[in-house]
């Protein structure tokens, strides 16, 4: 794996920013660190990039304990970069290349990847927020690192800028980059990431493949006036859960397994006639809420 995190803990006085957080990031993944503001996402990335020191725990990058030489192989965007607004995009990248000790001939390549090559001579003051963020990602790509670390890369952007950055991240993934990114946006993780770790108040709630952690459970919504309706619903096999929504009962099933005909037949065989049956999906927001409410 590209990154192994083992029992990281960090406190700020009485506040526990991270508590025994462990996970691994496989090569080629877009790994989302998902959580609301204050969940510990930025603290975690700052520890990984050696900006902060953990109270306890350890991590390895590219199979080695984090060190200066390893971090030179990683492109990082943890906050708004310090670009010079009176210089052009290309001139700003020349400064970044010198700091990173990268060949300036790489600038043309990263500008094209970021989609701002045609504005390379324009002063940064004329760039939109989305273009500035793409320039920041272009700076991360100097030297062609295999691993990229982004902290909320679409934060503060308009819908067009968000779409541009997400498309760029997907393109970088397709080119074989491993990307570790923090986000508080559930739909962003679903659309962009292959793997996810969910943080809440410094605790790791779940980690794994996005399709496994953020599954869209099937819901069969049913109703009957029969006196045994609830008893039969509770005995329904293969369901993963049951809840009430007003006059209806909602039966939860693993994604892709709900079968209205099978449910209807089961109730009929038990002597209960359903007056209403409908298959829906549990929203991703509901799933996320359930995970975070376990704390």
List each language-model region with its residue ranges:
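ABC-family P-loop ATPase nucleotide-binding domain
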Residues: 1-9, 294-295
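ABC transporter nucleotide-binding domains
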Residues: 3, 10-181, 186-200, 206
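Solvent-exposed beta-strand sheet faces enriched in polar/charged residues
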Residues: 6, 223, 278-280
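Non-catalytic surface loops within mature trypsin-like serine protease
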Residues: 27, 118, 224-226, 255, ...
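ABC transporter nucleotide-binding domain
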Residues: 166-254
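C-terminal coupling/interaction segments
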Residues: 255-295
């Amino acid at each position: 794996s590209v990154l192994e995190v083992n029992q990281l803990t960090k406190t700020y006085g009485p506040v526990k920013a991270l508590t025994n957080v462990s996970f691994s990031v496989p090569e080629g993944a877009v790994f989302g660190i998902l959580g609301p503001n204050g969940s510990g996402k930025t603290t975690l990335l700052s520890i990984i990039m050696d900006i902060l020191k953990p109270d306890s725990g350890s991590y390895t990058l590219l199979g080695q304990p984090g060190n200066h030489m390893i971090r030179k192989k990683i492109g990082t965007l943890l906050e708004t970069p310090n670009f010079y607004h009176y210089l052009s995009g290309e001139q700003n990248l020349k400064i970044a290349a010198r700091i990173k000790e990268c060949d300036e001939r790489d600038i043309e390549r990263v500008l094209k990847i970021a989609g701002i090559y045609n504005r390379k001579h324009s002063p940064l003051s004329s760039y939109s927020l989305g273009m500035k963020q793409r320039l920041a990602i272009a700076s991360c790509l100097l030297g062609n690192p295999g691993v990229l670390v982004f902290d909320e890369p679409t934060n503060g952007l308009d819908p067009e800028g968000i779409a541009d950055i997400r498309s760029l991240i997907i393109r970088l993934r397709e080119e074989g980059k491993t990307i570790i990114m923090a986000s508080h946006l559930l739909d962003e993780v679903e659309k962009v990431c292959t793997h996810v770790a969910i943080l809440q108040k410094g605790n790791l709630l779940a980690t794994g493949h996005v399709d496994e952690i953020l599954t869209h459970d099937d819901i069969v919504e049913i109703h009957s006036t029969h006196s045994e309706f609830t008893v039969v619903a509770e005995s329904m096999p293969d369901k993963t859960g049951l809840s009430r929504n007003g006059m209806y009962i909602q039966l939860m099933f693993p994604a892709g397994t709900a079968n209205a005909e099978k449910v209807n037949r089961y109730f009929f065989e038990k002597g209960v006639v359903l007056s209403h049956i409908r298959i829906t999906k549990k929203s991703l927001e509901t799933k996320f809420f359930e995970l975070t409410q376990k704390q």
